[in-house]
Amino acid sequence: MSTVLVVGADKGIAHSISRQLHDRGEDVIAACLFDGADLAAAGITVEPGVDVTSQESVEALAARLSEKGVKLDAVFHVAGVMWLDEVGSLDYDLIRRQIEINTLGPLRTIEAVRPLLNEGAKVGIVTSRVGSLGDNTSGGMYSYRISKAAANMVGLNFHHDLSKDGVSVLLLHPGMVATDLTKDFPGEHSYITPEQAAAGLIKNIDNLTPETSGRFQHSDGTFLQW
């Protein structure tokens, strides 16, 4: 990797990815919804005000990068939300909102920056194991599961279409990570830190090849079923 765009870098996993890549000498562009002041203070290039639910916003990001002559060697799309719901009390506005962020977010963002991808570039889209059809043994979490299952399809489609340009795409499950996103997650779980998840996801993208493109991988390195 050399020039890396990290989307959703305000906090959590993407924040840690940005810092770890910067610390090892990569040229990191951190796309943040807010100002990303602490990342900027650390010497990381910050693109503030990037809203993945807005076509205008992500196209403006791509235009700014293009005007600066930026070419991307890797993209980590991490921005996402998780609101829990159950059958009998489904909020369809909430479902639409999660799809807007978790599914259409990576679709519109990667489509916008696609012309900036170098041949041989790598794209990592953070989804979730709960979006796996084969792994769903408990039900519930309707809107989150739906949005992440669809995000997996977004990534698989990008694999097929971008491979023609020499770009590899990986779907990423970070594991059970202790962030604001998971604080209300049901059940007892053994959590890892955002720093641990980031290190695993970076390693996955480092090791990504055209032969492993289009797969779904845990931050611990294991490949997951769809």
From Swiss-Prot:
Keyword hit for Amino-acid biosynthesis: no
Alphabetized InterPro entries for the sequence: NAD(P)-bd_dom_sf, SDR_enzymes, SDR_fam
A Pfam family that the UniProt record links to this protein: adh_short
Broad enzyme group: oxidoreductase
Catalysed reactions, semicolon-separated: 2-glutathionyl-2-methylbut-3-en-1-ol + 2 NAD(+) + H2O = 2-glutathionyl-2-methylbut-3-enoate + 2 NADH + 3 H(+); 2-glutathionyl-2-methylbut-3-en-1-ol + NAD(+) = 2-glutathionyl-2-methylbut-3-enal + NADH + H(+); 2-glutathionyl-2-methylbut-3-enal + NAD(+) + H2O = 2-glutathionyl-2-methylbut-3-enoate + NADH + 2 H(+)
Family according to the record: Belongs to the short-chain dehydrogenases/reductases (SDR) family.
PANTHER family: SHORT CHAIN DEHYDROGENASE, SHORT-CHAIN DEHYDROGENASE/REDUCTASE SDR
Function recorded in the entry: Involved in isoprene degradation. Catalyzes the two-step NAD(+)-dependent oxidation of 2-glutathionyl-2-methylbut-3-en-1-ol (HGMB) to 2-glutathionyl-2-methylbut-3-enoate (GMBA).
Name of the protein: 1-hydroxy-2-glutathionyl-2-methyl-3-butene dehydrogenase
